[in-house]
């Protein structure tokens, strides 16, 4: 068993779209920078909704980030940059888009004394768990579960409703579709719909 270095910690921020996950990630990283810890953010290259080079929350909050591909090489790049540049704190946005190897990589970084904060969706638009987030949740030292507000009734929303031409996307739609308010809404369990066709 590897010894746990002081300061190593794996934290996961999760919930549906529009719950404030990216905002919370940026706030936590900024807090560590204020505490004089060397910190960096990473984002998947697939997420270019608002910026090519920044992590950007739906509310407009933004922070410069390393952009890495959602491949095994991208996961290795996260480790290399973190260790070679001496980062004490790293944040990874939209972690659900990375391959499963990111789970072990982030766990190893935490074991080496890095404070790792991963932010990502827990469920896809059908209500099924994202495998990467699911695995990170069982390994996390701390879990921050955020809810949004249902766009139909105003109750706490725990689901991400995918829309196509303003209507719920059918079950056979592709799982990955990077988008914002034009493609998704936050919904409660009662108002989350996934038609078969």
UniProtKB/Swiss-Prot annotation:
The keyword Metal-binding applies. One of its GO terms (molecular function) is thymidine kinase activity. It is an enzyme of class 2 (transferase). The active site is at residue 94. Keywords: ATP-binding, Cytoplasm, DNA synthesis, Kinase, Metal-binding, Nucleotide-binding, Transferase, Zinc. Its EC number is 2.7.1.21. ATP binds at residues 15-22, 93-96. It catalyses: thymidine + ATP = dTMP + ADP + H(+). SUPFAM superfamilies: Glucocorticoid receptor-like (DNA-binding domain), P-loop containing nucleoside triphosphate hydrolases. GO terms for biological process: DNA biosynthetic process; thymidine metabolic process. PROSITE patterns: TK_CELLULAR_TYPE. It comes from the Archaea. The keyword Transferase applies. GO terms for cellular component: cytoplasm. InterPro entries: P-loop_NTPase, Thymidine_kinase, Thymidine_kinase_CS. Its main location: cytoplasm. Zn(2+) binds at residues 150, 153, 188, 191. It is found in: Cytoplasm. Belongs to the thymidine kinase family. Homotetramer. NCBIfam families: PRK04296.1-1. This is Thymidine kinase. It comes from Thermococcus kodakarensis (strain ATCC BAA-918 / JCM 12380 / KOD1) (Pyrococcus kodakaraensis (strain KOD1)).
């Amino acid at each position: 068993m590897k010894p746990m270095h002081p300061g190593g910690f794996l934290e996961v921020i999760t919930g549906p779209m529009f719950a404030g996950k990216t905002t919370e990630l940026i706030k936590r990283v900024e807090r560590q920078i204020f505490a004089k810890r060397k910190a960096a953010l990473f984002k998947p290259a697939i997420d270019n909704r608002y910026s090519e080079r920044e992590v950007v929350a739906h509310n407009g909050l933004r922070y410069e980030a390393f952009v890495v591909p959602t491949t095994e090489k991208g996961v290795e790049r996260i480790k290399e940059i973190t260790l070679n540049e001496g980062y004490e704190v790293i944040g990874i946005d939209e972690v659900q888009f990375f391959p499963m190897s990111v789970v072990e990589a982030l766990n190893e970084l935490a074991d080496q004394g890095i404070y790792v904060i991963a932010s990502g969706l827990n469920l896809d638009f059908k209500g099924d768990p994202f495998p990467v987030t699911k695995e990170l949740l069982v390994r996390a030292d701390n879990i921050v579960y955020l809810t949004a507000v249902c766009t139909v009734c105003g109750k706490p929303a725990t689901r991400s409703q995918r829309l196509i031409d303003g209507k719920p996307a059918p079950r056979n739609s592709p799982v990955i579709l990077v988008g914002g308010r034009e493609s998704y809404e936050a919904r409660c369990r009662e108002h989350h719909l996934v038609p078969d066709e």
